[in-house]
Each structure stands twice: as C-alpha cells, then as structure tokens.
Amino acid sequence: MAELKVSAIKEGTVIDHIPAGKGLKVIQILGLGELKNGGAVLLAMNVPSKKLGRKDIVKVEGKFLSEEEVNKIALVAPTATVNIIREYKVVEKFKVEIPDVIEGILKCGNPNCITHYEYVTPKFYVISKEPLKVRCHYCERTMEEEEILANL
C-alpha cells in the first residue's frame, strides 16, 4: 500500500478519522476557509483507513479548537479523533463525543420555534446518537442527521 505523505505542522490541530466525504463539511462548520492567522488548512479526502475503510483528514495550522467547535465536529463526524500538535509532536489526543445536550451551535429547523424570534439560546436534547436524532427544548421538534447538518 502506498504511504500517505503530508507535511507535518508545527502548531495546530489534526482532525483524523472523519468519515469519507465529510471533511469539507467539517471545514465549513468550523469556518476554516476564513482563518485570520494565515495558517494553512489541509484536507486529505478518501484516504485508506483500517478503522473506516476510507476517511478524510483535516490539518489546521496555528489553530486550537474550542469545546463548541469540537461539539460541532461530533455532530458531523462522530468517529473523529482530534490531535493537538505542539512543536511537531502530538501532545493531546481525544475522540470527539456527541454531548447529551447541545446548546448554541444548532438552529431549530422549525420556522415557528421561539428561538427564531426571541433572544434565547437554542437548546437540544440528544435522543439517539446512532442514528443521530435531537429534540428542541422549546418546540419539541425532532430533527435527524440531514436536517441537523443543514442547521449547523
């Protein structure tokens, strides 16, 4: 099997084990196309993986993720692993995890929900992680994966 050759990053974050085809969505929801620090963003798509068969990898130079950003990744790519890189070495590694309660990172798909009209933080309860299903705290609308991804 051919070896994947991608340059190492000195400081930043590597998001690994993203399901194949979801890497662009990860870049989009994190707003990595508008990085202000001048750091590179690298996307490797459809890379061979022992765990997933095929996977995507995102490398972000000079950026470390917030808890909110990690939670967003979990909604798009629940199998992802986040690696924190300092001085070219992995100093921290963890799997993303879908939280039981999601606040402030997802919009309700119900156009009549109070979250669209009042100054309240959208809040959802995770009903199921596989397949992903959430319920709005305010209007009780249930959303499944496709609608969740459209409302991130």
Swiss-Prot record:
GO terms for cellular component: aspartate carbamoyltransferase complex. One of its GO terms (biological process) is 'de novo' pyrimidine nucleobase biosynthetic process. SUPFAM superfamilies: Aspartate carbamoyltransferase, Regulatory-chain, C-terminal domain, Aspartate carbamoyltransferase, Regulatory-chain, N-terminal domain. It holds the Pfam family PyrI_C. One of its GO terms (molecular function) is metal ion binding. Involved in allosteric regulation of aspartate carbamoyltransferase. Belongs to the PyrI family. Contains catalytic and regulatory chains. This is Aspartate carbamoyltransferase regulatory chain. It comes from Pyrococcus furiosus (strain ATCC 43587 / DSM 3638 / JCM 8422 / Vc1). The gene is pyrI.
